[in-house]
Every structure is written in C-alpha cells, then in structure tokens.
C-alpha cells in the first residue's frame, strides 16, 4: 500500500537522564486512516495471509493502518491472536482496542487498561475482568513496571501475579513490545 505524504516515521524521545523516563515525545507521522481503496487492498491482503499462520501478533499503535474492518478480519481469521494496542503520546485520547474481539492473548500496561476502561480508581484486577468479558479475551496481562505483571485467565477466572526481576527500570521504552513477543509464544 502506498500512502501519499507518508515519509518514514520519525520519533524523537527526550529522556530524563537520571531516571530514563520519557519527558517529551515529538512524532512526525502521517496517521490519517487509509482511503477506502487502500483499506480494501489491505483487507484482501489480510484475508490471504492471516489464515496461513498459527500465531498472529498484532501491535496496533493507532496510526491509521488497521481499520475496524481490518481488525474484524484479523480476529475472525486468526488461529491464535496476540494483541498489543498501545496508547502513546501520538494517539492518546482516541485510540482504543474496541475493534478487537475474541482475542487469545492481550498485553497492555496499567495506564493503558485504565485509559481503555476510562477508569482511574478501580483495581487493576477488576478492570481486567471487565475488559476480558467486554472483548472476550482469554488471557490478559497487565504490566506494572517494577511492580511486575498481573495475569488474568478468563476461563478459570484466575488472577496470577508475576514479580519484576528488576527493581529499578533502566530502559522501559520498548519493554511492552519485548514482553508481547515472549508471552505470545
């Protein structure tokens, strides 16, 4: 798919050198949604490719590539679907994973589940149960930085906790992507 006015995405992150926290992110990106013709091409690509694989890993960054139709096809045609629908400085406020249903495995961080559920007060565990029911997610993992991760299995209605090995986060940029690739296997 060729999308006009779409140069290579440029992301500049400004970090606090003392704690490696991102202070500011400046993004140069064309995150407009695909045209109807482009979406049709992309959906045809998905129809042909997704059924060929035992595992489909989707990282939806909310930059306009995956339409509701595309997400529906991915969910319908995947034998096993692992999803990460991130909230970042370029998409906060309008990006959601609501287009995805019947997902085998989802990994998001604590801020992302709070954003998704529009809830900053309830426990992570109760939000996990609600999101799993709402989206029909079999296994939901929420990362919490140095507090470790919380894992929820919908079938057994069971919560498990996994402590973090690192007590100090050295570089958390990309940590969710790395966790997704490991958990999806």
List each model region and its residues.
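Short internal beta-strands
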Residues: 1, 81-85, 106-110
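Short, ordered loop/turn segments at secondary-structure junctions
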Residues: 3-5, 61, 86-87, 111
């Amino acid at each position: 798919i060729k999308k006009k006015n779409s140069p290579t995405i440029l992301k500049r992150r400004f970090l606090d050198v003392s704690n490696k926290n991102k202070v500011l992110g400046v993004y140069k990106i064309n995150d407009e949604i695909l045209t109807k013709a482009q979406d049709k091409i992309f959906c045809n690509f998905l129809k042909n490719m997704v059924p060929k694989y035992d595992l489909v890993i989707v990282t939806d960054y909310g930059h306009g590539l995956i339409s509701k139709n595309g997400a529906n096809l991915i969910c319908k045609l995947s034998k096993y679907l692992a999803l990460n629908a991130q909230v970042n400085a370029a998409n906060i406020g309008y990006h959601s994973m609501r287009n995805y249903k019947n997902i085998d495995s989802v990994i998001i961080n604590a801020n992302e589940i709070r954003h998704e559920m529009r809830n900053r007060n309830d426990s992570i565990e109760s939000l996990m149960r609600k999101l799993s029911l709402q989206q029909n997610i079999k296994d939901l993992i929420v990362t919490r930085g140095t507090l470790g991760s919380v894992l929820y299995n919908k079938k057994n209605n069971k919560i498990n906790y996994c402590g973090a090995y690192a007590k100090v986060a050295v570089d958390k940029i990309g940590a969710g992507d790395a966790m997704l690739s490991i958990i999806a296997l």
